[in-house]
Swiss-Prot record:
The protein's enzyme class: transferase
Record EC number: 2.8.1.-
Catalytic activity: cytidine(32) in tRNA + S-sulfanyl-L-cysteinyl-[cysteine desulfurase] + AH2 + ATP = 2-thiocytidine(32) in tRNA + L-cysteinyl-[cysteine desulfurase] + A + AMP + diphosphate + H(+)
Protein name: tRNA-cytidine(32) 2-sulfurtransferase
Cited function: Catalyzes the ATP-dependent 2-thiolation of cytidine in position 32 of tRNA, to form 2-thiocytidine (s(2)C32). The sulfur atoms are provided by the cysteine/cysteine desulfurase (IscS) system.
Organism the protein comes from: Syntrophotalea carbinolica (strain DSM 2380 / NBRC 103641 / GraBd1) (Pelobacter carbinolicus)
Stored PANTHER family: AMINOTRAN_5 DOMAIN-CONTAINING PROTEIN, SULFURTRANSFERASE-RELATED
Pathway(s) of this molecule: tRNA modification
Positions with a binding annotation for [4Fe-4S] cluster: C112, C115, C202
GO terms classed as biological process: tRNA modification
Length: 259
């Protein structure tokens, strides 16, 4: 069925377009691999980018790329059917990540982090093979905010995600066009359009990333009393004032007049 182009659709599309403009995420001639996992975030990103592409003043291509990690029960057939229905160019990459994780994961290491690194490596390889210069990921505003808090609480760094950065391999630019879109809007869009929610089959899914879940609950609780909390936190990432921080690499503390 066609995507419902209602008020919510227009809101997400406008915010995504704003991020693309603010951070120069998409340029003329880009060939973009859109990572599609089968979750609400990646489906929403794919459909919104496609809608923007149809009316954009520049030309760019989208290719949906899925990395099947090899967990039992991961229904890639449902995903393929959805991609065919909407005419998306796609690449379904089947891997043996599940076996590699089982054999190589060190005691005490994060299952989710190791799996993510493996899948990201596959995405880069597939993007190279497809001639894509950019990789689009479905992280939304809440992901940025939660990562900001995680780094402060557990790592001791003032950092979140970047909406645009050069990948470690030096060949691809990673973009996150939904940086301004709240998770609640993504969830509502996915539900309104019946986008298929496809569990990855991960055996650790119920125990995955408890710290992030803790941050998610914290933000939700605080937002009950501070409705603009999320927008304030995402705004803070673009309003850094080094003179009020403690990082000596950003400020010279050697003079008596340091302020």
């Amino acid at each position: 069925m066609p995507i419902v182009e209602d008020r919510l659709f227009r809101k997400i599309k406008k915010l995504t377009g704003k991020a693309i403009g603010d951070f120069n995420l998409i340029e003329e001639g880009d060939r973009i691999a859109v990572a599609v996992s089968g979750g609400k975030d990646s489906w929403t990103l794919l459909h919104i980018l496609d809608s923007l592409r149809r009316r954009a003043p520049i030309r760019y291509e989208l290719i949906a790329v899925n990395v099947d990690p090899g967990f039992p029960g991961y229904r890639t057939d449902i995903m393929e059917a959805h991609l065919r229905e909407y005419g998306f160019a796609n690449r379904m990459e089947r891997t043996d990540c599940a076996t590699i994780i089982k054999e190589k994961l060190r005691p005490g290491s994060s299952f989710c982090a190791f799996c993510a690194r493996l899948r990201r490596g596959v995405l880069y390889s597939v993007a190279t093979e497809l001639g894509c210069n950019k990789l689009a990921l479905g992280h939304h505003l809440d992901d940025f905010v939660e990562t900001l808090l995680l780094n402060q609480f557990y790592v001791g760094t003032l950092a979140a995600m970047s909406p645009k950065l050069l990948a470690d391999n030096g060949q691809h630019t990673v973009i996150r066009p939904m940086v301004y879109v709240e998770e609640s809007d993504v969830a509502a869009f996915a539900e309104a359009n019946g986008l298929p929610a496809i569990p990855c089959g991960c055996p650790e899914e119920t125990r995955s990333d408890q710290n992030r879940q803790r941050m998610k609950r914290l933000v939700s609780q605080l937002a009950e009393d501070i409705p603009h909390l999320r927008s304030s936190l995402i705004g803070a990432l673009g309003n850094v004032q080094p003179r009020h921080l403690l990082d000596a690499s950003l400020k010279d503390f050697g003079t008596a007049a340091a302020d």
